[in-house]
Amino acid sequence: MNRILFLACAAVLSANAKTIQMPPTCTTPDGMCVDSKGRLVIATPNNDRTQPGAVFRLDKPCGTPVKWFDVPPCKESGYASPMGICFGPAGELYVCDNQKDSKGRLLCITFKDDKIDKCEVVAEGLDNANGVKYLNGKLYLTQAFLYSVKRGDGAATSGLYMFSASDRNVKVCNTPADEQCVFSDVTRNPQIRGGLNGVAVDAKGFIYTGNYGDGRVWKLMPGADGRIIKSEEILHAGGLSVTPDGMCVDCSGNLYIADMRGDALQRILPDGKVEFLRKGGFVRPSEPCVWKGAVYVANYGGTTLEVVPLCGSGCCQR
């Protein structure tokens, strides 16, 4: 059973928390990661379509975010909707392009002189490309909905997919029978339908993902070939997390979770303790990223990032 720990420094955290306003060209901040130059990188799907889907940078803590580049649009839809992002070891950026009508893509973007040099499609035909992380030459991508699966009970099916970083133009069918689907889950909550959403990896090679609708969080062990060989539910349905969305792990093995409908930022320690770093004051928090001694949280329902200082925790992030 998880132990709940409300931090003694919670009041200090709230008092010292800051808000960063994104530029007008960002209407929906979401996925985040840190690049090899130590900059915070932010994906913005811009759901209202008044602006193109883009990637922004924050070069220093509490600085001013700037647009880095527009994500090359899908030819069929005419737009890009970047959500989850992560970097590979050679500095390439992997982007979940969350499209409707099974037009989603996983992109690999390489750079020259800080500008896009090449944009390639790793996988296509995705129902709901959401989060992505790189681990040992593999890319682990969540699909919160597998719309192709029709269940008699109406429950929603979701999946964790694995691709090789060298894959290009892989077409998926969006069912657990896909060769690339290494873990699937069913959401039982009839009020909140989304399934596997956020994804994170730690230094020991474990993978974490959460069922958004049920409030469950999984710790997964991949085998030598990258496929999942063991799963453990570390947060249970109806428990502490209402809707676990984006997540990340720091170098101390702490797991941070943005709880969108719970309006909270949680941290699960390696010993299983659950801390609420902040409860309230977000606008549909979707993604956390540990950077330079603080947790930066994307307000998916707004146009800002919340900066929550940490109390003596490791400041590197995976």
Identify the function of each model-found stretch:
Residues 16-26:
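A short helix->beta-strand "capping" segment at the edge of beta-propeller domains
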Residues 20-21, 65-72, 117-124, 171-185, ...:
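Beta-propeller fold detector
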Residues 24-39, 43, 51-52, 73-93, ...:
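Beta-rich, blade/repeat-based domains predominating
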Residues 42-66:
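Beta-propeller domains
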Residues 45-47, 98-100, 144-147, 165, ...:
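Short loop/turn segments immediately following the C-termini of beta-strands
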Residues 52-57, 105-108, 158-161, 216-218, ...:
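A short loop-to-beta-strand structural motif that recurs across blades of beta-propeller domains
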Residues 59-63, 110-115, 164-168, 221-226, ...:
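Short loop/turn segments that connect beta-strands within beta-propeller blades
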Residues 209-220, 236-268:
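Loop/turn-rich, solvent-exposed surfaces of beta-rich toroidal or solenoidal domains
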